[in-house]
Amino acid sequence: VAFLYPKSPDTSDWIYAHDLGRNYLEETFPDQMKTICVNDVTEERTEQVLNDVIRQGADIIFEVAPQMMKDSLKVAVDHPDVKILNCSLNTSHKYIRTYYARMYEAKFLSGMIAGALAENDRIAYIADYPIYGMIANINAFALGASFTNPRARIYLAWSTSENYDRERFLKDNNIQVVSDQDMITPRDPGRQFGLYECSKDGRKLNLVMPLWNWGVFYEKMIQSILAGSYQSEENSEGRALNYWWGMSAGVIDLICSKNVPTGVKRLVDHLKSDIKKGDIVPFYGEIRAQDGTLKNKKDKAMKPEAIMEMDWLTDNVIGEIPTMGELRAEAVSYTHLRAHETL
């Protein structure tokens, strides 16, 4: 099983999470498979690297970035016996399956905690790439915050924008409660991850960490392949497949620290259980965009396609989706493949 990474696990929390999943896979199937990983795979090198790992014997390949999709299609057609899966949302192709996780479920719960703890009703959300899935995360967080605090306002910043300065952004907007990158990286094991609170003396008080359990997803995929059900899915459907799993499948979770008040944690645990059972969905009821447009009707659950393809922000978000020209050069190629039409 080969894993293709656009960066290295040391420098990216996204890649680090996937690499933890790869290690979990090796521990789960020690006698049935082995894994290899290739770091720093650029869009231009994708086809070459794919052919290299196939020559090394890889018959299952996980690509963890959407920009690899385009140059993978030729390889997938040339090697129909090799299973190639790309980690992206809404980019399915009949020759390549895609997979992603419903992180917005955890963000909704994280937003609830943020709303309950933001004394001045101001909360920061620091996003990275404006791709499919990210906008749903932001909006779910904003809806969660309004669930516990109707006055809450979400101040949005993009860490990949040219003029990004976290500390200045927080100071200028008088913000203490912050939703930042999802987890630490080995090279930068700081406290600025997940949901945290900035104290007046400058300390960071960690509250919540959303968790991508990629190991669980990869385990389920390998089990499906070993059992023969992966191929039967393909034969019976005859169309592109996009795996989009969440808390109910164990692929997404939320870890609360002891710094979260007991009453708030009890509420979050209860709602997390309801989300797992399907009794509660974050995108339900009347939802309006920043311009007042009605995006979801009362007593209705939003359709999955509408969640995947969001290119708008809820009416309690202050900020906007950046244009390509506002992103740093290294972020443009990552964003380009599945950028929103507003970019």
Whereabouts are the PLM-identified features?
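Hydrophobic alpha-helical segments within soluble ligand-binding/sensing domains
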Residues: 99-121, 211-231
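Conserved small/polar residues in nucleotide/adenosyl-binding loops
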Residues: 335-342
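Flexible loop/hinge segments that line or gate small-molecule binding clefts
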Residues: 77-100
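Periplasmic-binding protein-like
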Residues: 58-66, 85-87, 175-184, 208-212, ...
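An alpha-beta-alpha
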Residues: 22, 109-152, 156, 237-259
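Structural motif
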Residues: 34-53, 159-171
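Extracytoplasmic "Venus flytrap"
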Residues: 1-21, 25-29, 36-43, 66, ...
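Extracellular/periplasmic periplasmic-binding protein-like sensory domains
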Residues: 185-266
